[in-house]
Amino acid sequence: HKTVAAIRELLAVNMPSGSLGRLAERGFRPATVLDIGAYDGEWTRSVKALFPAARFVMVEALAGKKEELRWVAEAFPGGQVEVLIALLGAEQRQRVPFHVMETGSSVYEEQTTFPRQAVELPMTRLDRLLTEIAAPALMKIDVQGSELDVLAGAGALVEAVEVLILECAILGYNKGAPQLTEVLVRLEEAGFLPYDIADLTRGLGGILFHFDMVFVRKGSPLRPEGMLW
């Protein structure tokens, strides 16, 4: 029983909901949750249980996922969950190359052997897609290397964000995409500091190549200072 309990505890620590659960315990109650790179909506489904009163917006680049995401949204009545189909980036562009894969679709092509299809999609900025978001906001960006581009395209909307979750790479998994060191610098410049890590992904030989990092705004009471133990 102790072994099972230890495994469950380890899984809770490594899952994004574990990080957010700890933030909830510290009093974090977002008014808005942005799920950028929503894919099948599973992240929104699980996090909605943590923050039932929040308005959720799922943004996904692949139009083929719209119906699946709509089913997720309809499970929460009252218009609390919205679905938007859009490829987000740092600028407005009529056409950009996009590599369609089962779970790793991206502007930045994966350096893997998994099958993909090259297409072109229009790109927009988040601050063109949404005019405002209620604070405090939680923003999760999981877009296979385009995280900083999406953040740049958020413009003044970032001012409402208290907690950010970004997929961060420590190896060149997506060709030309920023790696962890650049992400940390850019996020500090934007006013955010690391809080937690979750969802570690390993490749051949157990090599860690990316994980989700949770950031909170500088000076936030969510990030403790002083005596920690």
Question: What is each model feature region?
Answer:
Residues 1-229:
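Phosphate/nucleotide-binding beta-alpha loop and adjacent structural elements of enzyme active sites
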